[in-house]
């Protein structure tokens, strides 16, 4: 069974479901540990995805600043 990479939104939804299960349902210790472990993995993946997105946004902003700087020097 091959798993496709989950989108950020899918990971967040699964993480929310895990938190709800841990908060609201009577789950065994073993299941709680499994859910906690899965939640930690999802949290790390979400954090990584956000950092990648932030890096891309910063790169795009730097390109925009660079393009405006080039326009100003050619306009003079």
UniProtKB/Swiss-Prot annotation:
Disulphide bridges, residue numbers: none
GO molecular function: exodeoxyribonuclease VII activity
Subcellular compartments: Cytoplasm
Catalytic activity: Exonucleolytic cleavage in either 5'- to 3'- or 3'- to 5'-direction to yield nucleoside 5'-phosphates
Pfam families in alphabetical order: Exonuc_VII_S
GO cellular component: a single term: cytosol
Domain of life where this protein originates: Bacteria
Cytoplasm found in the keyword field: yes
EC number of this enzyme: 3.1.11.6
Keywords, ordered alphabetically: Cytoplasm, Exonuclease, Hydrolase, Nuclease
One BP term from GO: DNA catabolic process
Family: Belongs to the XseB family.
PANTHER family given in the database record: EXODEOXYRIBONUCLEASE 7 SMALL SUBUNIT
Summary of the function given for this chain in its UniProt record: Bidirectionally degrades single-stranded DNA into large acid-insoluble oligonucleotides, which are then degraded further into small acid-soluble oligonucleotides.
NCBIfam families assigned to the protein according to its UniProt record, in alphabetical order: PRK00977.1-4, PRK14068.1, xseB
Assembly and oligomerization: Heterooligomer composed of large and small subunits.
Protein name, UniProt field: Exodeoxyribonuclease 7 small subunit
Species, as recorded: Staphylococcus epidermidis (strain ATCC 35984 / DSM 28319 / BCRC 17069 / CCUG 31568 / BM 3577 / RP62A)
Name of the gene: xseB
